[in-house]
Amino acid sequence: MEEVITIAQIVHRGTDILSLNNEEIEALVDEIYSTLKGSNDIKNIRLIDFLFTLKDFVNHVRAEQSKLPDLSMPMEAYIRQLLVDPDVVPIVSEKKKELRVRPSTRKEIFLINGTHLAVPAEAPIEIYGLKLRLKSFSPQCFMRMAEIGSFSPETLGYVASGANLTNFIRVFMKCVDQETWKKNGEGVVVTTKENIIQFTHQYIELYKFLRSGGHSWLINRLAEEMVHRKLDREDQGSHISNIVETEEIEPEENIKRVIFFLKELSTMYSVSPVFTSGYMPLLYDLYRAGYLEVLWNPVEQKFLQHAEQREKEQMILQQVDMKLTEVITQARQYFKIMEEKIGRVQSDAIREILTMEGKVDDPNSILQEVIKACGKQEAELITTEYLNIKKQWELQEKNACAHLKLVKQLRSGLQYAELLKVLESIRVLYKEKNNTTNWNLCKACGFKLLCPHVDMLIQLQAAEASYDTMRTKLMKFSGINKEKENNQGLIYSYFCKICGEELAHFIQEDRTADVGVIGDLNSKLRIFIWQETMKACTFIHFGKLVDVKQFANIAVNVCLPLVYSIENIKKEEDYDPLTQLYAVIYIYAYILNLIYSSQKNKEFLTITIHGMKADSSLNAYVTFLLEKMMQQYSGIINQLSEITDQWIANNFREAFKKIIHQNGLQGLSVQDDTKVLLTEILLGPMYDYAATVARIDGSIPMHKPRTPKEAEYEFKTVIGRTPAELLSQKEFYDKIYTSKYRPDFTQLARLNDIYFQEESLRVWWGGRDEEKTSTLIYLRAYELFLKYLQNAPNFNSELAEFKTYENAYGEQKALLAQQGFYNIFDPNTGRADQRTRLFEYKRLPISTLYDERGLPHKWTIYVYKAVDSSQKPAEIEVTRKDVIKKIDNHYALADLRCSVCHVLQHEVGQLNIKKVQTALKASLEFNTFYAFYESRCPKGGLHDFQDKKCVKCGLFTYIIYDHLSQPELVHDYYNNYKDQYDKEKMSIRSIQIKKDMTTPSSETQPKPPQEPWTFDYGKIIKTAKILDISPAVIEAIGAMEGRSYADIREGQGAPPPPTSMDDPRLMAVDSAVRIFLYNYNCLRHVSTFNKPPMHVERLVKHLSYEEKEDLEKVLPNVVNEYHTTFKHLRVTDPASALLYSIEFLCVSFLTLYEIKEPSWVVNIVREFALTELNTIIQSEKLLSKPGAFNFMIFGEDFVCSGEDSSMDDISAYSSPGLFGEDIIDRLDDPFSIEDVDISLDVLDNLAPQ
């Protein structure tokens, strides 16, 4: 390989590199750096371009010198990072003279400072007399290159005029010593300082041009113009002489020097594998194949012949590909017509035959099989139908109706306002109005115009409906559902039954191993980003009222993928402080992008920071956000010792660039008044508190609303009006539910003290310290809110004080994060579950829930106080139904009173806790006592109630459950029979102990069934026919172990009938029946499961909650007397017990498979029965042929022949190798990627993480 002339050698002025020591190397690097830094000609040029050419210099010195300064990273990795990340700039450290890499600043990235230069689309360019035009580049292309910093305005002018190429060639020729060239035929660079700077500047400009795609244009244009014009040497030389005016050199020598330069340039890119996939593949390929001879001999016949032959081959390949595509399309259309005309069964049978013969894509073979199976008339019918369809395609292709342009605008537009206008124009052309079952046809041409689901989708998008709403409304068009599984869970896709377009999809995550409500990191980090974004709303000024939930949801969708894309963020059990810090950085970068977008696009909603002007500079916003971030999240930052302010600033800058690159400019939508009103009600603390109280006292269900009807019922119960009634009278909301008071947020920070009070609720709630106590904490917070209600004027100052407390609380929480580690066996997953938790008691006074009599509070009395002291009366107490009648805007809600003990809500802490505990214990004792004697009588036997009183013991029926209405009767009866109760309780305990110590008796003879059983072989035959298997396979359930599957299928080698009740076959078949019955009962009673099994949930996912409840009524009970009969036969006749279990399995299967009504259940039960019985048989197959894997479980088509595969060679199932005859097919493979250059960033993505 020829030695490459590099700029490093130029700057060194001829010094022998091999003779340099370490100090001289450092001095040389300093000299290069200072030369670039001090040159005015290259002031605005990024150092990446110049230092890039030091590759050969550094590699050469590293190979020859053994004591080099240690570089911060390997050279190959350094070059790779330069290519992959154009925003990384190498610098030379002033202290250690090492090559380092740091992120570039915005000033270095955007060099043009917003300047745009208009360039004609066909600017003339002249190179060696060849008058070319820039047809390959448009002005937009040049503008884009200028925007990303590839060119300065001056450079852009060079590109447009071609001066960068011609000037560079001139300077290159000036820098070549003429005498040396004539002697050796090689160029030696002249070492004057002016030539160095000029050469360097021109080289960098040319390199940028080539790197941006100019190499492709350069070679194509030179080759094309020279071949077509067929210039001879004299003409070419005359043109060159006109360009090179400064020196009298032979034209032929000039061309040789250009070839020398191009060869050297291509050689530089071929030194390392990194550059073979870089920016010069075309130039390198031309040089390697000898095509640069075009510059030397324009009429080279070999080049022309090769180009002509290659073009012919490409045309032939295109024709073959088009013909193949047409044939395959015709074959597929044949099958579609067959399904419609002669039936699905016959079509599948023909498809199976042709698939085995390898002719499934041959239309002629399809017609021949149709003639064999159905007759010649059916084949002619298929051919005629296909010709009609093809003619329809041709007519549609030639159609020039005006609706085509409108549909194209509709499907490619971005602004919903414009799309609605286009949609209105399209609706005018509808042949039928209000069509939702088929294509909307054009009344002008008669062809398909628009699918109804697209019409509805455009309307929903214009109304800014949520994804869930759109998916729900579009489901009525769904007719094709597909399901597949990936690492995230099951993906369900829904397709339109009219046009086949995808409507929606969602992921049902596999949560069988999750612990708690939120068990995976994705949900935790998503919630963290959502919560922190909502907190950021406190300092953001939106200008108008916006949907803050939409703001947070967009932030999650934007930031979450970017956080996960960071290399050192791993999806572990729980996210660490570093992950939280990255999430906060991207949240604030998203906020900065919103501010930046509102400044750039005036149509967007104006977004700024409270206290800052809307036209403030971007640097001011960056400074504020960085300071806010470091102040607000100092608790997180303090946990990371290696994090500095500069690190945060650098990552914030990179996050902002990534968000701009990925999302561009972003804006937010403004809410309407109706939505704002309902949102304020539902999210307000009053509604939340009222709904919580209503759930506690049983007015509404404990669970959240699951249907619109349940949501409307909850709203009406809590508010007193339906949403429609409330919206019609907004003044009603203003009068009753608007208060001038605000809560004292400083007191909320002191809620931490509640955790450490003496009395605990954990004793009374059986250890449920999360769900119940969280509700009590809310009630405690409301008590504080009422207690400090009068501090409304100091609200703003106290809010600021609360924010300072929040930081300290975060630090305290970080210190408490040193949690214990536990390995707990999880019975759901069958493996150890790793948890970290403090198991810390959350303590609240018991009087928050119960009064001094042990009764739960009922907060049903509302206490209103007059806003004005002159108003009479000063205080009003009303029930919920009287609020509308008696309360106006002169009164504000002040407190709640318990209707049981008449204590005010904020005074529950003053109740005597000892009395509450004593009353609760007494209540527990009474409950146990009266539950014990609910049916039995202390006098013996059962109660004999006459006129609601037992004539034997004197117990009244109304005191069994109500212990407070008649306390004297309750205590008298309790005192009379307490001793008797204690004796009977001890007697029961002693009997239980005696039972535990007694040796169990031997198994008694089981009772015979009520009806005798006789074996019916017809059930097995019928089941086998439905499953398309041999009856012998069903008979072999429980007896496949150790047998060849071929023998099982033929009924050979079956073991003799069992003779013992302990035969393992009986237990195996009985287990299969029990599994079938268990899964069936899960399906029948699916409405009772909080989380049903996945295979059952998949079957009923489309049913409503009411339909799931009806499954228990419409599905039959198939158990009957199975267990009784099996137990009896197992002891008396084991052989009959085996046959009975197998027959019962088939009878249960047929009972479910043959269900005819109701229609909405048929498909569910049939799919369940087929899946369950096939699973049992497939599981049994795995036990056949011990010592070898049974390929038959994948179906008979997988195995090469129907013979016994126990002795098959494993090589029959392995893929073709890379040696011998296998390599022949590989050479002819047109899809091989062996010779394709793969970009290094792709290789990085393929590397193991």
UniProtKB/Swiss-Prot annotation:
Keywords in alphabetical order: Host cytoplasm, Host-virus interaction, Inhibition of host innate immune response by virus, Inhibition of host IRF3 by virus, Inhibition of host RLR pathway by virus, Late protein, Viral immunoevasion, Virion
Gene Ontology cellular component annotations, sorted alphabetically: host cell cytoplasm; virion component
Induction (UniProt): Expressed in the late phase of the viral replicative cycle.
Cell compartments where the protein resides: Virion; Host cytoplasm
BP GO terms, sorted: symbiont-mediated suppression of host cytoplasmic pattern recognition receptor signaling pathway via inhibition of IRF3 activity
Ranges annotated as spanning the membrane: none
Chief location of this protein within or outside the cell: virion
Family: Belongs to the asfivirus M1249L family.
Function: Together with the penton and the other minor capsid proteins (p17, p49), forms a complicated network immediately below the outer capsid shell, stabilizing the whole capsid. In addition, blocks IFN-beta transactivation mediated by the cGAS-STING pathway and regulates the transcriptional activity of IFN-beta. Mechanistically, suppresses the phosphorylation of host key adapter protein TBK1 and degrades host IRF3 in the cytoplasm.
Subunit structure of this chain's protein: Interacts with the minor capsid protein p17 and with the hexon capsid protein p72 capsomers; these interactions form a rigid zipper structure that stabilizes the capsomers. Interacts with host IRF3.
Protein name: Minor capsid protein M1249L
